[in-house]
Amino acid sequence: MASLTDYAKNLLARALVGRQPSLPVAAWAALGTGGTDAAGLAGEPAAASGYARQPVAFTGSGAQRNIAPLRFAFTGSVGTLTHVGLYDAVAGGNALAWGTLGTPATLNAAGTITVPAESLTVLAD
């Protein structure tokens, strides 16, 4: 993922100096139309379209990559989605990271957008 959010940067800074922040216990992937370091992902589709964030399990010793494909199912059109985000909750919660999809996904009818296994990478640099 291209960028950690300000929230995630603050978590890391507190962890590095031993302040023991409350770390996420799960990660959820989201799709959207943009993003910023301050707010994270922007333009998530409405739940009425069948959209829901997907749980993500990661593996790796340095760079963390999604173990399994992520499948976002939609019951109707959502247009073009260009970004992916990582959150600490299935709804609401805190944005942790965001970045652009390798290829924008356009969905003009019901269907599924799949993010392949090992294509979502989280790396602090």
Predicted regions and their residues:
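Small cysteine-rich, disulfide-bonded extracellular modules of the LU/uPAR three-finger superfamily
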Residues: 1-84, 88-125
